[in-house]
A protein has these predicted regions:
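Oxidoreductase and adenylate-handling cofactor-binding alpha/beta cores
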Residues: 108-127, 161-168, 297-305, 310
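Phosphate/diphosphate ligand-binding glycine-rich loop within oxidoreductases
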Residues: 49-126, 140
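Phosphate-coordination loops involved in phosphoryl transfer and adenosine-cofactor binding
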Residues: 1, 72, 143-146, 218, ...
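Short beta->alpha connector loops
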Residues: 10-12, 34-37, 56-60, 79-82, ...
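N-terminal glycine-/charge-rich "phosphate-binding" loop or analogous flexible N-terminal tail
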Residues: 1-51, 55-56
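Glycine-rich NAD(P)-binding loop of Rossmann-like domains
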Residues: 125-158, 185
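Rossmann-like dinucleotide-binding domain for NAD(H)/NADP(H)
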Residues: 97, 227-317
Length: 317
């Protein structure tokens, strides 16, 4: 039987979305619900597996990991692409990499949950409500405010439509901004500097990788309005985390809504956890029952197709 590892099932829900018992005669499954301690631990625990079913970018599938898993034949990732998989290393080993479809609206929805939570001080008000207090803060309206979007792809476009519905002014910048799309979505194209300086809300929606690494550092924070809010539901390294902590702890900006981090899971002692003006969620932008149903169902479809010699949804670059 083919040995298959299902990685990073943090919530122990994979079997709620796919019936592994029906496949028990063909595959030997093992579910990993905890993160690996480090890459050496991953290599040791995954040494005998022929297929990895991975949940987004929770475990990096590096060149070193791939080169040390001698039996590995298939890497099946949830989502259309996964930047944590070294595709060149997989290609050299003739390992097939496949993906799945994915809904982007959950990330847009969470973005607005964070924006609204920050605007109406929900973290403080909810905590205070359970302690017996009543109306302890004053929030802000969205109408008439400026929201600057770093990235106007699928998620950024969805965010812009809702911003317009709220009566906000929408600006956007990225290195490959589509001006026709800006016109279509009633979005004002601008420079990065103008976006940083004029926005009341700055929301990040570009892909990870070297292009946008440290796109937001202390330099950008110092240029923002003192009343600005930063929202990041894209990738952690886009915002320099040390600089974010400084900006929040010294009130350089009003607050931040963060779903993604430089290192995940976020350390229990990370300073972000103790900042009152940081509204944090544990990378749940894509975590919905609807998305998980797509992921797990299609990962099994991918696996079956690979084993039958007719791979589907192959990722090559």
């Amino acid at each position: 039987m083919l040995k298959v590892a299902i990685l990073d099932d943090y919530q122990n829900v994979s079997q709620e979305f796919v019936d592994l018992k029906k496949l028990s005669g063909k595959y030997e499954f093992k579910i990993f619900s905890e993160p690996f301690l480090d890459e050496a631990d991953a290599i040791e625990q995954l040494a005998d597996f022929e297929a990895l079913l991975i949940m987004r970018e929770r475990t990096p599938i590096s060149k070193n990991l791939i080169d040390n898993l001698n039996d590995l034949k298939y890497i099946i990732t949830s989502g259309v692409r996964n930047k944590s998989v070294d595709l060149e290393a997989a290609k050299r080993r003739k390992i097939i990499v496949c993906g799945t479809e994915s809904n982007t609206n959950p990330t847009c929805e969470l973005t607005w949950a964070l924006i609204l939570g920050l605007s109406r001080n929900l973290k403080t008000e909810i905590d205070n409500m359970y302690q017996g207090y009543w109306q302890t803060t004053v929030g802000f309206e969205l109408k008439g405010k400026i929201i600057g979007l770093i990235g106007l792809g699928k998620v950024g476009s969805q965010v812009s439509k809702i911003a317009n519905a709220f009566g906000m002014q929408v600006m956007a910048w990225s290195e490959n901004l589509d001006l026709d799309k800006c016109k279509e979505l009633n979005v004002l194209p601008c420079s990065k500097e103008d976006l940083i300086k004029t926005s009341d809300y700055i929301s990040i929606h570009v892909q990870g990788g070297d292009r946008y690494k440290d796109c937001i550092t202390i330099k950008e924070f110092d240029q923002m309005k003192k009343t600005a809010f930063l929202i990041n539901t894209a990738r952690g390294p886009i915002v320099n985390e040390d600089d974010l902590i400084i900006a929040l702890s010294t009130n350089v900006i009003m607050g931040a809504g963060i779903d993604v981090y430089e290192n995940e899971p976020l350390s229990e002692t990370n300073k972000l956890r103790f900042l009152p003006n940081a509204l944090l969620t544990p990378h749940i932008g894509y975590v919905t029952a609807e998305n998980y149903s797509i992921y797990y169902t299609q990962m099994i479809e991918d696996l079956e197709a690979c084993v039958n010699g007719k791979p589907i949804r192959v990722i090559e670059k």
